[in-house]
Amino acid sequence: MRIQSTLFGTIPLTLALALAGCAPLVTQSPGGKLSPVNAVAMDGNDRVILKGADVVAYFTQNAYKQGNPAIKSTYENVTFYFSSAENKALFDKEPTRYLPEFGGYCANGIVYAIPWGGDADTWRMLDGKLYIFGGAGSRDAFLLDVPRNRQLADKYWNEEVKGSNAFTQRTLRTTVNRVAHYKSGAELAAEVAAAKK
């Protein structure tokens, strides 16, 4: 079988491949107050925050709990799953109280103006706020200097990331326009290891 590449055959294929990568752009940019947000499309819902983790459980049970797709609420075009009807009721009464910082992106990534995805099971409550991290190494690096890292993350979230397209922001800040204090994963891991000695 011979595949012919023609101008009219190549353009639709190229366009289809390019658009296939657009789903996360739409999913993570719902508009409104929660944009961008660490969300995925799942269970027939366009934007499920933190892959369905129950955001209320972090606050009320000090625990990561996976939510149930049958117990859900929508706030600012983002779907939230809950592990119980009680948690859903708490969220519905006061949703902003239970929102993760930085749209649920890795808090340590936001220190560098980079909205990396966070893992719902790697988290920390600090002063009544929920911080999500991309992994234990990211969490440990953030915790080395919480006041400084929160100040930087708040600054970059409010000045650059909030309201932006997460993909574009991530691409720019990891390639051509790094912040002056940028550190690689290896550099952060070395700092964490030295602090544990």
Segment roles from a protein language model:
Residues 23-76, 96-197:
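Intrinsically disordered, low-complexity terminal tails and linkers in eukaryotic proteins, enriched
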Residues 72-90:
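Beta-strand cores of secreted/periplasmic/IMS beta-sandwich domains, seen most often
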Residues 14-16:
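Extended, charged alpha-helical coiled-coil scaffolds
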Residues 18-21:
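C-terminal motif of bacterial Sec signal peptides marking the signal peptidase cleavage site
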